[in-house]
């Protein structure tokens, strides 16, 4: 599923339609879901070389505890359900591991913010946020399991991808009012579409106004024209194409890049993702949590577009017609990019905004000839001049 812009041009009403006033209203609603996700395996967990590693990206570790017996029977291997050393087995029963947000070396700095996720026996936090023992001495040795290890978490596969996306919705409303007579017609259109995307905090809203006329005056002058205004406002977290290695880099990466490469045993929808004190990012690696990304980093675009055309035509004789035809198209796009402080790359935050635009005017002056000179000879042709102006 994707979000986009549907551009509807309001045309002058066709005078061949029924005469009088006509009013039409249309309402439609649709839901959308992600079309497909990768086909994930639930046999092997986080790590490398068939060894569990709570700080690793890929799923190259040993089998999930629930799969150990089947794998051993099939391949003659000797995997166990334990993923920790014998010295830590008292803290972690088979099939469990230290909580990944606090129980691996890269996340010691997060321990002071999540005391409930830590095994602490006889230790506490000092005033500076560092663990101290009963005499107030700092404990900095990560081999002291009773201090620095996270609480046990059960190692099992989680549906992080399917649980992340939401059901999108598309609501469209349109009102059309038209009136026509033998020599003239008028057509007015007002429409709005609102689309909430499949990614949280992603959406687009479009409002359009259009007016068209079509008339032949008593003096023979033919007039046809339309003018349209469209406003398109959209917002989205970083959700471009996914990187295929190590998630890309920091806050600059895509939500998809963070999400699709998560270890199967990492409970994205169950673990904390926001620092309860600073509001910053919380993750098991030096990258931004996809849940934190969609809530805090956002790109916006607000496009205002005006376009239209006008044609004037007059028959000087039954074989000679003069015509003036012009059109214009102008838009401005106000964009912004917000990165909340506390992210991995943009730790102090960032904000930028800029405006892009374009204007084009096109005019044609034409003299059209269509004359029968004799039964065997006919002269047809167009003489004209074009003026085109573009600016950005």
Where do the protein language model's features map onto the residues?
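Outer-membrane beta-barrel architecture
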Residues: 24, 174-178, 189, 212, ...
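Short coil-to-beta-strand
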Residues: 182-186, 332-335
């Amino acid at each position: 599923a994707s979000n986009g812009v549907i551009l509807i041009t309001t045309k002058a009403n066709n005078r061949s339609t029924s005469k009088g006033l006509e009013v039409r209203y249309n309402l439609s609603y649709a839901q959308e879901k992600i079309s497909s996700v990768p086909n994930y395996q639930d046999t092997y967990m986080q790590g490398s070389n068939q060894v569990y590693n709570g700080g690793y990206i890929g799923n190259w570790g040993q089998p999930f505890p629930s799969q150990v017996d089947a794998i051993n029977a099939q391949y003659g291997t000797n995997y166990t359900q334990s993923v920790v050393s014998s010295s830590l087995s008292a803290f972690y029963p088979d099939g469990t591991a230290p909580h990944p947000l606090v129980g691996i070396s890269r996340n010691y700095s997060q321990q002071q913010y999540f005391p409930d996720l830590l095994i602490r026996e006889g230790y506490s936090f000092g005033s500076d946020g560092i663990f101290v023992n009963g005499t107030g001495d700092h404990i900095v040795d990560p081999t002291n399991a009773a201090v620095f290890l996270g609480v046990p978490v059960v190692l099992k596969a989680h549906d992080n991808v399917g649980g992340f996306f939401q059901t999108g919705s598309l609501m469209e409303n349109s009102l059309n009012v038209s009136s026509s007579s033998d020599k003239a017609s008028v057509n007015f259109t007002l429409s709005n579409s609102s689309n909430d995307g499949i990614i949280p905090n992603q959406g687009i809203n479009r409002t359009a106004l259009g007016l068209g006329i079509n008339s032949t005056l008593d003096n023979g002058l033919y007039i046809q024209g339309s003018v349209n205004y469209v406003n398109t406002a959209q917002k989205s977290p970083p959700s471009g194409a996914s990187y295929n290695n190590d998630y890309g880099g920091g806050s600059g990466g895509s939500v998809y890049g963070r999400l699709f490469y998560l270890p199967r045993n990492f409970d994205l929808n169950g673990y904390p993702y926001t620092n309860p004190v600073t509001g910053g990012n919380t993750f098991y690696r030096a990258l931004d949590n996809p849940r934190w990304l969609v809530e805090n980093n956002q790109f916006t675009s607000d496009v205002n577009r005006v376009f239209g055309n006008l044609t004037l035509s007059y028959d000087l004789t039954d074989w000679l017609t003069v015509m003036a035809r012009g059109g214009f198209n102008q838009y401005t796009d106000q964009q912004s990019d917000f990165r909340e402080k506390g992210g991995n790359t943009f730790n102090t935050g960032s904000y930028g905004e800029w405006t892009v635009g374009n204007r084009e005017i096109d005019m044609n002056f034409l003299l059209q000839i269509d004359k029968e000179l004799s039964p065997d000879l006919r002269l047809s042709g167009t003489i004209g001049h074009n003026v085109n102006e573009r600016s950005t």
